[in-house]
Amino acid sequence: MYDVLPPELWVKIVDYSGEISLLLTNTSFFELFNLVNLKISVIKYVVENNLICVLKYLVLLKEIKHPIMDKTIMTTKSLNKFLIKSSKKGQLKIVECLVSLGADIKSLNNCALGLASENGHLEVVEYLVGQGANVRSNKNYAIIWASRNGHIEVVEYLVSQGANISAEDNLAIRWASQNGHLEVVKYLVSLNANIRADNDYAVRWASQNGHLEIVKYLVGQGANIRANDDYAVRWASINGHLEVVKYLVSQDADIRALDNSAVKCASRNGHLKVVEYLVSSGADITVENNCAIGLASRNGHLEVVKYLVAQGTDIRAENNYAIKLASLNGHLEVVKYLVSVGADIKADNNFSVSQGAILVN
């Protein structure tokens, strides 16, 4: 019934309703599409609505050299744009159709392959490589990002196709370690990736992010936990990763490096269990004029403050720095506790009192 409507009526109906899908009921879909006033391309509409049957029909029209394909119903730029988007989403059938319609798989430095790899779409990766995509393009982006996101099957496939696991100073294994992808890390090590690249970045960032099994594995492979002034144990402490801290200490990490930075920063961030463990292992809570309690007070970590006081820290150090910072930042319970154990609210010309009044007002 709809097929017998004149083109001008179709245009009016679609322009009024905004429903381009109505055109799909007409065999002259593409001709009508070019007549409506809605600002949208054929490819954009078809791809975004996952109309694979329409894409296949377009491929057929191209193969038989139908005159409609000579008209500007799609451009190479738009084909490339949606090839990249579809590759990122893992839409293999759409990717195949777009390539058949003339999309360039190597556009934007093989961006389609890079994004398909990054997001773990193995079938799309295999298809694009089969069509000539370069696995080493853009500084081996594909394998680096597949490793970063833990897509082991994609990593293995890219390696089989010649990807360089050592690119960008072994960035693949560094990022895999940072993000906790043990299987990828082990695989890359089996291919002789350098775990000590960039001043032992891999073990430092695995520690920082709390990936204990990766830390243990890297240490077993010869990683240096003492690199960069014991960065590993410092940042594991800062982020509250107690089990990682314990393991690193068992491997002779120096918890007092950089003037006891580990316990100071763990106190600052409120990681009570880490603070307790570090103190039991010999960390000094009194360094830098009892900086640890000042930082804990500033950030309102009452339980840490109580623990530090129990361990003999000086709450009146630096002219009652702790209560002044607690007052300045509005941590009433910390202020009350510090007062109860002898902090002087009148220190520094009644600084704490004045800050409390300001916050109340």
From Swiss-Prot:
Family annotation (SUPFAM superfamilies): Ankyrin repeat (SSF48403)
InterPro entries: Ankyrin_rpt (IPR002110), Ankyrin_rpt-contain_sf (IPR036770)
Keyword Repeat: yes
PROSITE patterns cross-referenced by the UniProt entry: ANK_REP_REGION, ANK_REPEAT
ANK repeats: 77-107, 108-137, 138-167, 169-197, 198-227, 229-257, 258-287, 289-317, 318-347
Keyword Plastid carried by entry: no
Key words of the record: ANK repeat, Repeat
Disulfide linkage: none
UniProt-recorded name of the protein: Putative ankyrin repeat protein R901
